[in-house]
Structure formats: structure tokens, C-alpha cells
């Protein structure tokens, strides 16, 4: 299953083996940099501090609110720090609801923010759901904030959608999948071979730079993103920093819907939205609402 995803695999022990997009690849091979390798999300404080300076995603909130009702039980797959489920718990009187994410740091933050006994944060793999989740059925299953983008191929996404369908309570239950809007991947082709740098200030007051290098595969609609942030210098004068290489499939409704149908699902509606921050700010996103066929 790891072959079909673009993140969260095992980290290489030898940082020189990580392949970054040009020109950041020169940092790895320079011989003057001592680097750490990160999964990027939640497991590296420097990247984490940068993320705190970006706009917190809310573009999928209204779509989720449109299908959630008082008394519902919700399963949020790839919940991160619980931003979506915590929001819904404030807006609705939910029954037993669960969020699951592979990051222990994200789940720790989720647990720290929970103020409801019926909201549960679980550290685990969304491809191997634990018994406390599989023994239940849910009114709404969510993949918020483009969670499915780390899935690179059709077969892997079908496995995940079939698993989500198996957790639905009845014919009135729904699955919510947040993706890019049709046409957005083509608009992102300008990012191919582009390098950007973003200044930000860390919580300790230090200024820092984060560098991004991109390679876009327009045939497979996969965006390769390499990232480097410098954290200082060591006693030998070498650069210290952290690197990560991410791959994201730019899923859209047109690409998702045939796979959903193969998974025994049908489309109820598609809700338009847009990217709130970053290089793709203002570009179209979409929330696809699915139900059992």
C-alpha cells in the first residue's frame, strides 16, 4: 500500500539518499549541510512553526455543515489535529465520533483540545482501522482539506473509499471528500521547475526562510514538492536544517467520481470552494458528497 501513497513512509537513515527537486538537491549533496528528514506534517517543529503562520484551513467547513445534523456520529479519516471534527462538535450535538490520524503529535494536540466526552482522537492508519472504529457505523465519514491528495493511484483510492463505505450506517449516511476543482491541476502546471522562498518568524522571534522547489507531472497530475528550512549552524560551521520531499496527486471531481462508482458509491452533489492560502490561493477546490449506490 505504501507504493500508492506520497507521504508517511519510513524516513531514510541516510539523508543523502533523499532526492529533492532542483535546485534544493544541491543542499543534500553539498557536504556542508547537516540535515534532518521530516514527513513535514506535525513531526518537525520548524515546519510546524511555519504552518502556524499560514491560514488555517476552513474551506471545507460549510460543506461538512450541510450534511451533518444533531445526533450524528462522524468519522474523520486523516483528521490531523482535529480541526474539522472539533469545529463540527461546537456547531452540532454529536454522538460518539472519531478522528484518526497516523501522526502521534497531531493526535496529541487533538486530545488536548477535546472538551467533549463523545469525541475521540485515535492514532492509527486509515488503511487499517482499529476495532473501536470498525465495530461502529457512522452517519458521516469525512476526508477534509484535500486529505486524499497523498494517495497517488486509482487502486489505492478505491481501497480507501470501499473502507469508508463499509463504515456508513445506512442509506442516509454520507461521505465527504475534499479535492481540487476541475481545471485546477492544469492551472498549476506553471509551478513545474519553479522555486519559491517564504520568510516567516519563529515563535522565539528568530526570522527564518522556507524554500520550496516544484516539479509537476502533467500526465499523472502529481505535484512533487521539495522543501528546506535552515535552523542554524553547528559547531563546525555547517548549515543545519530540515528537508522533506512530498508527492501529491491533484484529485478532482472528474477523476474521483469514476473511482467512487467502482467503490459502490454515487454522487449526491459537488460543492465549489477555493484555496485559501499559498501558491494556489484562489484556485478552485471542490467537496464531493457521496452516498451508497
Where are these regions (language model features)?
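SAM-dependent methyltransferase
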Residues: 177-254
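Class I SAM-dependent methyltransferase SAM/SAH-binding core
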Residues: 83, 88-128
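A short acidic, Gly/Pro-enriched loop at the edge of an enzyme's catalytic core
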Residues: 131-140
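A short SAM/SAH-binding and catalytic strip from SAM-dependent methyltransferases
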Residues: 139-155
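Conserved class I S-adenosyl-L-methionine
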Residues: 3-70, 83
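Class I SAM-dependent methyltransferase "Motif I" SAM/SAH-binding loop
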Residues: 78-80
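C-terminal lobe and adjacent flexible extensions of AdoMet/dcAdoMet transferase-like proteins
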Residues: 249-293
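A short glycine-rich, Lys/Arg-flanked "PGG" loop and its adjoining helix->strand segment in the class I
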Residues: 158-170
